[in-house]
Amino acid sequence: MNLFFKYFILACSLILFSNTSKAEVTYSCWNCMTLDTDAEGNPNGAHEDFNAAAPNVKLVAVQYPYGDYVQSLALSMRTGTSDDLMAFQVGSMLSTYAEYLEDLTPYAEKEWGANWKDKFLSVGIEQTTVDGRLVALPQVMSAAGALWYNQTILDKYDLSVPTNWDEWISVSNILKDNGVVGFMHGAKDSWINYDLFIGIANELDPGKIYEAEAGNISWTHDSLVKATSLWGEMFSNGIMQEGALGNAQYPDVHQAFTSGKAAMMTMGTWNNFSTFTNLGLNGSKESYGFTEDFKYGITGLPDMNGDGKHGRLFASPDVSIGMSASSGNKEEAWSALKVIIEDLQSTYAKDLWVSSMNGVPFDLSDATSDFAKEALNYQLGMAENAYGKREFIYSEIKAALGDALQNVAVGNMSALEAMQLVEKASQTVKR
């Protein structure tokens, strides 16, 4: 990104959070939650909450389109010209730039004491720690691996939420026979394919997929081959809709599920606002052109290993924020970061984000119904008990897995051949 374009973005999207601040802290991001309209419809809600919590800090935030952000980050981090605070995806992005980031452990210990980790969900802190250094803090969590269902549709056909693999097949096919899409999936998109595959793999044999990523076991492990086989079967046994490989998760699947055209999908906690709040659902109704009120519910993926329990969610920080090691005002930057991470959690809770910190409930004041409240409370319990992560550390493995899943879906590879492809990529990774 050239200098002119960066200044153009600054001129167009600069947001100053305080006119009386004593210290200026710069923050660059692609998903600047501190800039968002809050769940009460107030476009300045997060701004005002930040100013109230940090009256002596002026936060200068620049929000880039994602592609431009990645390009800008690559240049600024390596040249020491980055902003004081930067947003990161955990996994490969955070690992790539970890060496240019401040270790936040001393700041956390000073702020919250020696047991500061107890304040956070452990699954979040584990993923913002690289080579023993706390290089970022998780802002909110995205938990995936859930089966979202429309209870209204299931009730119409006297069906129950599937609790195991055979029931999943049966329910999907009964709905199909009645002209309703059972489980809809946007297999065109790799990101949701990863989510579904991780969910299947963890349900069959928890943690094996992470051991394979770490290089401790082969990707041809029996449980991973089995997971790949089940993934492939979904395209032929009636669980997935016809044409799944041509559908995107957004808007195709989201629209079909939300508007009552599909009874089930897999999705994550980021979907809460548009489904379970009056404000968000009214926006969905307006966008998708429907008026019906549905009962949406959430549970884990159906049992596939025969233990009688549904799958557990897995989670990663939706956004993590790090501090540049080259920042010239680190104490002020920490003050701003602390507010974004801790003090604004109640603001994020209004939008039904899962907190990165322990003991922060959803704000259910705008929930659409008691059924929605029950679903959200159940989801929060699952999220707090989440096992494992969403993001892969190594881009080589991620790319190979995406190709492998596509090849199995179209019948070009067997499950074993697909996992051999991923294992070959895994062996090239320098860990």
Language model feature labels by segment:
Residues S21-Y100, K110-W116, V161, E332, ...:
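Conserved N-terminal structural module of periplasmic/extracytoplasmic solute-binding proteins
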Residues D84, G113-T152, G182, D307-F314, ...:
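A structural signal for short loop-to-beta-strand junctions that line the ligand-binding cleft
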Residues V90-A144, S160, I169, L196, ...:
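Hinge/lid segment of periplasmic solute-binding proteins
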Residues W270-T291, P302-D403, V429-R431:
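C-terminal lobe and pocket-closing loops
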Residues V130-Q139, I169-T220:
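Extracytoplasmic/periplasmic solute-binding protein
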Residues T105-F120, L204-K226, G280, E286-E292, ...:
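Short, solvent-exposed loop/beta-turn-alpha elements that line the ligand-binding surface or hinge
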Residues W30-C32, A46-H47, N51, M93, ...:
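Extracytoplasmic/periplasmic substrate-binding proteins
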Residues S172-L175, A214-L245:
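Glycine-centered hinge/linker elements that transmit conformational signals in sensory
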